[in-house]
Amino acid sequence: GRVVTVYHALVIEKERKCLNFELSVNVKEVQLARPPEGAKATVSIEACARHLKNVDATMSIIDISMMTGFSPDTDSLDRLMKGVDKYISKYEVNKGANDKGTLILYLDKVSHIDEECVKFYAHQYFEVGFIQPASVTVYDYYTPDNRCTKFYHVEEGSALLGRICQGDICRCAEENCFMQQQIEGKITADMRVNMACAPGVDFVYKATLTELQPSDNYDNYVMTIKKVIKQGTDEDPEDKTRNFISHIKCRKALNMQLNRDYLIWGVTGDLWRQPDGYSYIIGKDTWMEWWPNERECQQRENQDLCDDFETVSDNLEIVGCPN
């Protein structure tokens, strides 16, 4: 069999507080009338900077790493250099290691009053399983240590946001992070039972988040399965750990916290057969809801939720699904 390894590379250069420059980055997917040959998709990347001191910054550099598979459009860079406004004095495109190219823009000045914005196109020439986030850094040529870095990525919900790949198997990472996001209003015990019993739902677990392993573009939530409420394809997960994989863009929305318990269910299509058991994708068909512990259940604001969970659990374990 094929050995599947998931590498957990942490983003080392976290966004540090920027003291000398204000920096923002905006990425949008665009449709060009005449895209260059071989381009599968095009984005516009706009970086805006302002100097935070009370004078303009003199010669400054904007250093842009490209998202995997993307290359900058030189025509749009030439226009920035040669236009009436002459936004940049020159640029350099460097092909980096492992196909992460970088683009260096030289600016004669960065104003301390107005933002200086540079906007150019980048084309996707080859598709990768997962587009890695990239970064934009601005610094003064003479004091390169005082730099400001921001990470950027294709916009939420973009088809380019792409897929989670392990080896040669890819799955879409939906922009819908988990199921309850699509429900408005109060969620009752009956609703939960009906949804957990819907066709396609494979398993229902109570699980504890024991470890979070972040990587460049997705998070691996290591969960210990406390209780199998409804048995699924994964034959004997109780008291064992399982990996639940989610797109990094969903981290805030999921807001999962270590050592908390969760009610989880998901569909068969989100199970991933691996040599040592199954991994699970967290996506728009995954229910992921905080399950308060005994102490938290005694707090008044959690009592209804805890009662609901007992009802759901008893119903599914004792009565089972109606279908």
Curated annotation (Swiss-Prot):
GO terms under biological process: complement activation, alternative pathway; complement activation, classical pathway; inflammatory response
Domain of life: Eukaryota
A Gene Ontology cellular-component term: extracellular region
Domain NTR: from-to ranges: 177-321
Disulfide bonding pattern of the chain: 177-250, 197-321
Cellular localisation: Secreted
Broad class of the protein's primary localization: secreted
Matches recorded under Pfam families: A2M_recep, NTR
Keyword set, alphabetical order: Complement alternate pathway, Complement pathway, Disulfide bond, Immunity, Inflammatory response, Innate immunity, Secreted
Keyword Magnesium attached: no
SMART domains, alphabetized: A2M_recep, C345C
Disulfide bond among keywords: yes
Gene3D superfamilies: 2.40.50.120, 2.60.120.1540, Alpha-macroglobulin, receptor-binding domain
Record CDD domains: NTR_complement_C3
Official protein name in the record: Complement C3
Lineage: Eukaryota, Metazoa, Chordata, Craniata, Vertebrata
